[in-house]
Amino acid sequence: MVNRKYPTGPFRLVPESFLVSKHNAFTSYSRTCSFLHKGTVAIFGPSSIHSSSYIQTLLDRKEIPHVETHWDRKLLRHNCLLNLHPHPSILTQAFLDVVHTWNWKNVVLIYDSEESLARMSPFVSSFRRWVTLRRIDLDHFGTYRSSLTSIKMTGATNFIIECSIEVLEEVLKQAQQVGMMTERHNYMITNLDLQTIDLAAFQFSGTNITGVSRYLLKVNRYSGL
């Protein structure tokens, strides 16, 4: 966009990227240093919260802009950091508004990791009604069906799903496979990347699936799902 807007400008912006495993902070730090040697003017990421704090410290010291897009529990606003992720308090209030509007008397919070539970802890502590916490784990077949089946047996119908985007679509498909996608069931998905998932498989189930937009922070209803 900048290059197109200023085609005759004295410089052009050239993006460079690299992939690194989620917990490999050392490689993230080393690759960032190599970028800085090339004259990099800004760093976006990493997406992993495990590595981001190390990169943030380096870029603050070098006074290089650092842009984050992930949830950050500490939200340390340093001189060169810009975090584009909605503040946890704003998301918590949005989730509370949704469940209160629907007048849910109880809800099952389905999560897939300790990090997921930490993201939802403000909601759990603020919700004045009954919240059941259920973690889903892979069974010996490599699926979530065992965990989901046990949740189904409780008879619950109102669910909040807090899962990583990497597994979210599979969790929804397997919930449908075990009979948790009917007109009686309601889902609120907290992952802000829900729009990247194809929900066509659930359009005739009668299930209400609701997500929250990252950009406008308004509730989007997927009618007829």
Model-predicted segments: where are they?
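Signal peptide-proximal N-terminal region
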Residues: 1-15
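N-terminal extracellular/periplasmic ectodomains of secretory-pathway proteins
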Residues: 4, 49, 119-139, 145-158, ...
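Short, well-structured alpha-helical segments in soluble
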Residues: 14, 18-42, 97-98, 143-155
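A conditional alpha-helix N-cap/helix-loop micro-motif detector
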Residues: 24-25, 88-92, 137-141, 168
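Short alpha-helical segments and helix-capping/turn motifs at coil-helix boundaries
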Residues: 27-30, 50-54, 93-94, 144-145, ...
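Extracytoplasmic ligand/sensor domains, especially the bilobed periplasmic-binding protein
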Residues: 37-136, 178-211
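Immunoglobulin-superfamily Ig-like beta-sandwich domains in protein ectodomains
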Residues: 68, 77, 81, 140-152, ...
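Extracellular/periplasmic ligand-binding modules, especially the Venus flytrap/periplasmic-binding
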Residues: 164-167, 215-225
